[in-house]
């Protein structure tokens, strides 16, 4: 008898506890904090509805499609232990709701509208299960871990980097000089800071030229392949691509992008160009803490990390566990595995809500960066293992004798840790001793150890598992 107008509870349509999830569904785990008086089933169903086919009232055009085929479903709700009135709502989305190969569209659907929803006090997307059918529509990282090692001819150890400081204010020539000294001293990479784009004191083209000169000179002197992450991030996609093309013409191995401020569409565009043209792509996560730091609202970084692997990047900053920036060990290692490994089992103790199969999509190297120095080297080597990039900005440039000795100190410390580990020593217990022994052979390392012997950044992590 026609359609029934009016408002009805979301849970009547979108809460389906008997639903068996399909292998092709995108699964989401939301941390839901309902407004007082809103039952969790209604809150979970509201999230499923508003992030898929639903709207606030019944509409007659519902009759022109098959809601059962296209609607999101809240299929399970569980209370969060130790939190009052907070729940994990599991939502399944049919694959047809999403455009192939578009992280942009995936996020617009899943987190686009629902976070401002009145029935919720707060909402956080904790994890996503990306089905293999959807993974296969993405190129993913331009090259991945193995191809990067082959390009650089560097095996069996973490890679070493350094962010050039002061991040703003240097002229292009002085900037290039700092790059040369770091690379000559033994680092594999130097890095543009995330906010170095093309400012009045240093235009991008000048920086690219001087940095290329620096890395070729350092390569000739050391016999090692060197790189500098040239930041191609720009105000328009066209300008970004112009910078990437110039980097390729210079013959440098790697460019860089700020993927959250630049946006997923720009990032995926750049990643495709990088694969087609043999450039590695370093990703900085500037702005991530705005989205991921609050425990009960936003998007957890593990979701942003998965999204980056799909969109494309060969390196991404992933916290340090030991430095000045946020990151708890188990949670950090959880998303480090999601970045690097091909198959990751569900493991709630590390914050992993779903088993994820990447079906041979290349992996991403996690970058540890922020407030770290030579005394942290044993812990970093143990925590992150070989497939990582360890980046020391102040920990290189703050060396009392200058940049090149700072780079020497870091390289000696790293080689000492890798050697000790390969000999079967326990880096966690004997770390300080290993560094002290290496100081005997390296005055540069001894000087670095003097400067930073007491520094620790110790505050409790804001975002913990409980």
UniProtKB/Swiss-Prot annotation:
According to the UniProt record, list the residues that bear N6-carboxylysine: 191
Provide the GO MF annotations for this entry.
magnesium ion binding; monooxygenase activity; ribulose-bisphosphate carboxylase activity
Query: What does the entry comment about cofactor binding?
Result: Binds 1 Mg(2+) ion per subunit.
Q: Does the keyword Lyase apply?
A: yes
For this protein, the Enzyme Commission number is 4.1.1.39
Q: How is it modified after translation?
A: The disulfide bond which can form in the large chain dimeric partners within the hexadecamer appears to be associated with oxidative stress and protein turnover.
Location of site Transition state stabilizer? 324
Residues binding substrate, per UniProt: 113, 163, 167, 285, 317, 369
Write down the InterPro entries for this protein, in alphabetical order. RuBisCO, RuBisCo_large_chain_AS, RuBisCO_lsu_C, RuBisCO_lsu_C_sf, RuBisCO_lsu_fd_N, RuBisCO_lsu_N_sf, RuBisCO_lsuI
Q: Where in the cell is it found?
A: Plastid, Chloroplast
Record-annotated active site: 165, 284
Q: Which cofactor does it need?
A: Mg(2+)
Q: What is its main location?
A: plastid
Keyword Magnesium among UniProt keywords: yes
Give me the reactions it catalyses: 2 (2R)-3-phosphoglycerate + 2 H(+) = D-ribulose 1,5-bisphosphate + CO2 + H2O; D-ribulose 1,5-bisphosphate + O2 = 2-phosphoglycolate + (2R)-3-phosphoglycerate + 2 H(+)
- Alphabetized UniProt keyword annotations: Calvin cycle, Carbon dioxide fixation, Chloroplast, Disulfide bond, Lyase, Magnesium, Metal-binding, Methylation, Monooxygenase, Oxidoreductase, Photorespiration, Photosynthesis, Plastid
Question: Which residues get modified to N6,N6,N6-trimethyllysine?
Answer: 4
Single biological process term from Gene Ontology: reductive pentose-phosphate cycle
Where, by residue number, does Mg(2+) bind? 191, 193-194
Gene Ontology CC terms, in alphabetical order: chloroplast
- Assembly mode: Heterohexadecamer of 8 large chains and 8 small chains; disulfide-linked. The disulfide link is formed within the large subunit homodimers.
Q: What does this protein do?
A: RuBisCO catalyzes two reactions: the carboxylation of D-ribulose 1,5-bisphosphate, the primary event in carbon dioxide fixation, as well as the oxidative fragmentation of the pentose substrate in the photorespiration process. Both reactions occur simultaneously and in competition at the same active site.
Q: What else is known?
A: The basic functional RuBisCO is composed of a large chain homodimer in a 'head-to-tail' conformation. In form I RuBisCO this homodimer is arranged in a barrel-like tetramer with the small subunits forming a tetrameric 'cap' on each end of the 'barrel'.
* Family in the record: Belongs to the RuBisCO large chain family. Type I subfamily.
Protein name (database record):
Ribulose bisphosphate carboxylase large chain
Its gene is rbcL
């Amino acid at each position: 008898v026609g359609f029934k107008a009016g408002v009805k509870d979301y849970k009547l349509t979108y809460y389906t506890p008997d639903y068996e999830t399909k292998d092709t569904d995108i699964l989401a785990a939301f941390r839901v904090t309902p407004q007082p008086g809103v039952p969790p089933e209604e809150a979970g169903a509201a999230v499923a509805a508003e992030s898929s086919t639903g709207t606030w009232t019944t509409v007659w055009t519902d009759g022109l499609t098959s809601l059962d085929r296209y609607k999101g479903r809240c299929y399970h709700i569980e209370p969060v232990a130790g939190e009052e009135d907070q729940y994990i709502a599991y939502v399944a989305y049919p694959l047809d709701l999403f455009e192939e190969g578009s992280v942009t569209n995936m996020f617009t659907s899943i987190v686009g509208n629902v976070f401002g929803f009145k029935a919720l006090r707060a909402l956080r997307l904790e994890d996503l299960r990306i089905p293999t059918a959807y993974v296969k529509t993405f190129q993913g990282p331009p090259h991945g871990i193995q191809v990067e090692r082959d390009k650089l001819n560097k095996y069996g150890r973490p890679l070493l980097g350094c962010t050039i400081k002061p991040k703003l204010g240097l002229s292009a020539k002085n900037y290039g000089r700092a790059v040369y000294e770091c690379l000559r001293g033994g680092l594999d990479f130097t890095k543009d800071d995330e906010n170095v784009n093309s400012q009045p004191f240093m235009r991008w083209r000048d920086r690219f030229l001087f940095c290329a000169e620096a890395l070729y000179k350092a390569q000739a002197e050391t016999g090692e392949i060197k790189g500098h992450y040239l930041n191609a991030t720009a105000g328009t996609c066209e300008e970004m691509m112009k910078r990437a093309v110039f980097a390729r013409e210079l013959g440098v191995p790697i460019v860089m992008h700020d993927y959250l401020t630049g946006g997923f569409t720009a990032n995926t565009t750049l990643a495709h160009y990088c694969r087609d043209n043999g450039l590695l792509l370093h990703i900085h996560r500037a702005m991530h803490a705005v989205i991921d730091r609050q425990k009960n609202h936003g998007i957890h970084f593990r979701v942003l990390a998965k999204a980056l692997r799909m969109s494309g990047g060969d390196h991404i900053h992933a916290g340090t566990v030991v430095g000045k920036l946020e990151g708890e060990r188990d949670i950090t290692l959880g998303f480090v595995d999601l970045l690097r490994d091909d198959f990751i089992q569900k493991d709630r103790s590390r914050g992993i809500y779903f088993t994820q199969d990447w079906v041979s999509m290349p992996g991403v190297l996690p970058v540890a960066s922020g407030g770290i120095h030579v005394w942290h080297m044993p812990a970093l080597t143990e925590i992150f293992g070989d497939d990582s990039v360890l980046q020391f900005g102040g920990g290189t440039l703050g060396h009392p004798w200058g940049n090149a000795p700072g780079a020497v100190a870091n390289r000696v410390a790293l080689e000492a840790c890798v050697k000790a580990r390969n000999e079967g020593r326990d880096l966690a217990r004997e770390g300080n001793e290993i560094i002290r022994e290496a100081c005997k052979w390296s005055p540069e390392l001894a000087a670095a150890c003097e400067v930073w012997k007491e520094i620790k950044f110790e505050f409790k992590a804001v975002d913990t598992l409980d």
